[in-house]
Swiss-Prot record:
Composed of three domains: the N-terminal N domain, which is responsible for interactions with the ribosome, the central G domain, which binds GTP, and the C-terminal M domain, which binds the RNA and the signal sequence of the RNC. Involved in targeting and insertion of nascent membrane proteins into the cytoplasmic membrane. Binds to the hydrophobic signal sequence of the ribosome-nascent chain (RNC) as it emerges from the ribosomes. The SRP-RNC complex is then targeted to the cytoplasmic membrane where it interacts with the SRP receptor FtsY. GO terms for molecular function: 7S RNA binding; ATP hydrolysis activity; GTP binding; GTPase activity. It is found in: Cytoplasm. This is Signal recognition particle 54 kDa protein. Part of the signal recognition particle protein translocation system, which is composed of SRP and FtsY. Archaeal SRP consists of a 7S RNA molecule of 300 nucleotides and two protein subunits: SRP54 and SRP19. GTP binds at residues 103-110, 185-189, 245-248.
Length: 447
């Protein structure tokens, strides 16, 4: 899936096919790639319908080309498909912190227990592993081998068939030894299709241990079948989260991820390889960036981020116009940094008042002048203290000299910035509550 979609993005952005035709071709390739990755057909067509709806309803911001804007919509909607902005919390909320792993046979649960232990050990926690999978003869030996490999102690009783008893003893032992995180590897004797028995066993061990987190381990190769298992687990264990393993070895990883995300369950980690350190905190946006080709879309995402930051500053200016608060030099700094992310000066300088480049098509000399002015202003702002940025009225002549010396500028440069800032605040008060004033002030909306 990754290669096909990545190639489609590159072809779309660099090809000479007319825009409308290129969009249709891209959407067809996206549908084909997602379905071949075992993403549910209904989810796929719902996704592409949303993309088309946004194309018809929304207008591209001026800082993005039409093709860039389209890819930013694809990025946004794909991110939602795989879980959106939901950020998993991987930090323990208390110590000791008990994690219980559950999963069917073959899901990679025991290997994941070792990876998880290594993940937390690298973060400075004292970790203990409990081998409570009594149904698979090799489970204890495997966990012991992993523990020795990463220097983490393992508690197990190879001759005891009582999983609950082993789990309780193991947890008690590690609590006495002042371990920070205790990971319990429970039985995985049931195959897919026997989820009811798996969840019943999970509840029994849960009642005995009262763990702080229950994690269901799912093999990515089951694709969209993950929906039923994840859904039932999510309903049975409100504190639970999910790890999807073997993402590197199957074409169905996208299907498993989208299926789990559709249940509302939290995907905490994904396994990206066989090595002990190949466990990655799951982030939907980062995953989608990888699908689309980070190198191809990085500049687009940077522009979108700049636009979002700019809109926050614009909202602050509207508040100032309404008499709520005052614009600070910190806001000015944030505004300039946001505009710099949005692309060439020929597109964005006209949106900053007072730079002398307010013409629709600034000349090359005007652009150079504006660019130099921005460079000087940023240097001055970077030389100011927190108090000066928040309250510019305290900047007297001696402070101006210090700022100028610290930034390699003349005092006149600092004075010019402060005069512009004061004029800006006066102008904002003058146009208070007047509809469209912010657009006049900025020479036209960016979005």
């Amino acid at each position: 899936m990754l290669e096909n979609i990545r190639d489609a993005v590159r072809k779309f952005l660099t090809g000479s096919t007319p825009y409308e035709k290129a969009v249709d071709e891209f959407i067809k390739e996206l549908q084909k790639s997602l379905i071949s990755s075992d993403v549910n057909v209904k989810l796929v067509f719902s996704l592409t319908a949303k993309i088309k709806e946004r194309l018809n309803k929304e207008k591209p911001p001026s800082v993005l080309e039409r093709k860039e804007w389209f890819i930013s919509i694809v990025y946004d909607e794909l991110s939602k498909l795989f879980g959106g902005d939901k950020e998993p919390n991987v930090n323990p909320t208390k110590l000791p912190f008990i994690i219980m792993l559950v999963g069917v046979q073959g899901s990679g649960k025991t290997t994941t227990a070792g990876k998880l232990a290594y993940f937390y050990k690298r973060r400075g926690y004292k970790v203990g592993l409990v081998a409570a999978d009594v149904y698979r003869p090799a489970a204890y030996d495997q966990l012991l081998q992993l523990g020795n490999q990463i220097g983490v102690p393992v508690y197990g009783e190879p001759n005891n068939q009582n999983a609950i008893e082993i789990a309780k003893k193991g947890v008690d032992t590690f609590v006495k030894n002042k371990m920070d995180i205790i990971i319990v590897d429970t039985a995985g004797r049931h195959g897919y299709g026997e989820e009811t028995k798996l969840l019943e066993e999970m509840k029994e061990i849960y009642e005995a241990l009262k763990p702080d987190d229950v994690i269901l381990v799912i093999d990515a190769s089951i694709g969209q079948k993950a929906y039923d298992l994840a859904s039932r687990f999510h309903q049975a264990s409100p504190i639970g989260s999910i790890i999807i393993t073997k993402m590197d070895g199957t074409a169905k990883g996208g299907g498993a991820l989208s299926a789990v995300a559709a249940t509302g369950a939290t995907i905490k980690f994904i396994g990206t390889g066989e090595k002990i350190d190949e466990l990655e905190i799951f982030n939907a946006k980062r995953y989608v960036s990888r699908i689309l080709g980070m190198g191809d879309i990085e500049s687009i995402l940077e522009k979108v981020k700049g636009l979002e930051e700019y809109e926050k500053i614009q909202k602050k200016m509207e508040d100032v116009m309404e008499g709520k608060g005052k614009l600070t030099l910190r806001d000015v700094y944030a505004q300039i940094m946001a505009l710099r992310k949005m692309g060439p000066l020929s597109k964005v300088l006209q949106h900053i008042p007072g730079l002398g480049v307010m013409l629709p098509t600034p000349s090359e000399d005007q652009l150079k002048l504006g660019e130099e002015k921005i460079r000087r202003w940023l240097a001055a702002l970077n030389s100011m203290t927190y108090k000066e940025l928040e309250n510019p009225s305290i900047i007297d002549k001696s402070r101006m000299r210090r700022i100028a010396e610290g930034s390699g500028l003349e005092v006149e440069d600092v004075r010019e910035l402060l005069e512009w800032y004061n004029n800006m605040n006066k102008l904002l008060k003058m146009v208070k509550r007047r509809r469209g004033s912010i657009d006049k002030l900025f020479g036209g909306k960016i979005g």
